[in-house]
C-alpha cells in the first residue's frame, strides 16, 4: 500500500537515518508529483496525469505551520533532531523552495537550534542555481545516485526528465563536499527490464562517481517498506556491508541501513 503524507508538516517520526524527524511535505496532500518514478518508492507510482493545478502551500502558510509545530515541540522530548523535507515527491519542485529553506533556517534557529535541516532530493533540479544555492545552505543536502550507469538509473528511477549522468556528477562536484549521497541497492525486474545495481560493473562505476563527488557522507540502504514494483529483492545486510567497505576503502565516510 502506497504511503502518502496528508499534512504539510508531520511527525516527528523515527527515521533510520535522521533520528527524531519532523517531516515537511511540500507536494500536494492528494497525490505524488516527482521527476522520478522509482520502482521502490513508498509513495507508489506517479499518477498517469499529475494535477498541474494542485494547490501548493504558500511560503506564508508554510511559515505559520512550521512555526506552530516547532513552538509546540520546543523543549520537549519530541524536539526534532532533523527537520526533513521529503513527502509526496520531489521537494525542489515547489516554486518557492529557496524561500521556504530560508524560512526553515530562521525558525530552526529560533526554536530548535540543535536540529539539522535535511532535504531528500533526487537531484534533478540542482542545475538550477536557485535550487543549488538553497541546498547548499542546509545541513544535510541528501542527493540520490542509485547506480553507476545511466542505463541502470533509467531502469530503477524511471525519470520523466532527461538525465545526463556526466553533467549530474559535475553538478554534485560543485558542492565541494557539502553533499550526502544516498543509494538504494536492489535487484529484480520491472516489465522486461532486469534491475541490478549491485553487479561488479555497476558498483565500480558508482565508486568512481563517489571519488569525483567526494561527498561528506554516503548513505546506502535497502528496501524497508512495500514497493510499487513487486518483483524486487531486498539485498542482505552482509552484501550491503561489503559495499560499504568498498566505500571506506576510498577513505570516504559511509553509513549503511539494513
How should these model regions be labeled?
Residues 2-17, 28, 67, 187-258:
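Auxiliary Fe-S-binding modules of radical SAM enzymes
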Residues 9, 38-41, 141, 181, ...:
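Generic structural hydrophobic/aromatic packing signal, biased to beta-strands
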Residues 21-23, 82, 142, 180:
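Short hydrophobic-acidic sequence motifs that mark active-site Asp/Glu residues
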Residues 40-137:
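Conserved Radical SAM active-site core
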Amino acid at each position: 500500500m502506497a504511503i502518502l503524507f496528508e499534512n504539510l508538516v508531520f511527525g516527528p517520526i523515527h527515521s533510520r537515518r535522521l533520528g527524531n524527524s519532523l517531516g515537511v511535505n511540500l507536494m500536494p496532500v492528494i497525490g505524488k508529483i516527482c521527476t522520478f518514478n522509482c520502482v521502490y518508492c513508498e509513495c507508489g507510482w506517479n499518477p498517469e496525469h499529475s494535477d498541474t493545478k494542485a494547490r501548493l502551500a504558500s511560503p506564508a502558510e508554510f511559515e505559520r505551520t512550521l512555526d506552530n509545530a516547532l513552538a509546540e515541540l520546543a523543549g520537549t522530548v519530541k524536539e526534532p533532531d532533523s527537520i526533513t523535507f521529503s513527502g509526496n515527491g520531489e521537494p525542489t519542485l515547489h516554486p518557492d523552495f529557496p524561500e521556504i529553506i530560508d524560512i526553515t533556517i530562521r525558525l530552526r534557529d529560533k526554536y530548535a537550534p540543535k536540529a539539522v535541516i535535511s532535504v531528500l532530493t533526487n537531484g534533478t533540479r540542482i542545475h538550477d542555481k536557485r535550487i543549488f544555492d538553497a541546498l547548499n545552505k542546509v545541513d544535510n543536502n541528501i542527493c540520490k545516485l542509485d547506480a553507476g550507469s545511466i542505463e541502470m538509473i533509467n531502469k530503477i528511477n524511471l525519470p520523466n526528465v532527461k538525465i545526463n549522468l556526466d553533467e549530474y556528477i559535475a553538478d554534485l562536484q560543485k558542492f565541494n563536499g557539502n553533499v550526502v549521497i544516498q543509494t538504494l541497492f536492489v535487484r529484480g525486474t520491472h516489465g522486461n527490464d532486469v534491475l541490478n545495481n549491485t553487479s561488479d560493473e555497476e558498483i565500480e562505476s558508482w565508486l568512481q562517481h563517489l571519488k569525483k563527488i567526494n561527498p561528506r557522507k554516503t548513505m546506502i540502504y535497502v528496501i524497508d517498506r512495500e514497493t510499487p514494483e513487486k518483483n524486487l529483492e531486498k539485498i542482505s545486510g552482509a552484501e550491503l556491508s561489503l559495499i560499504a567497505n568498498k566505500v571506506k576503502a576510498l577513505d570516504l565516510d559511509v553509513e549503511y541501513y539494513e
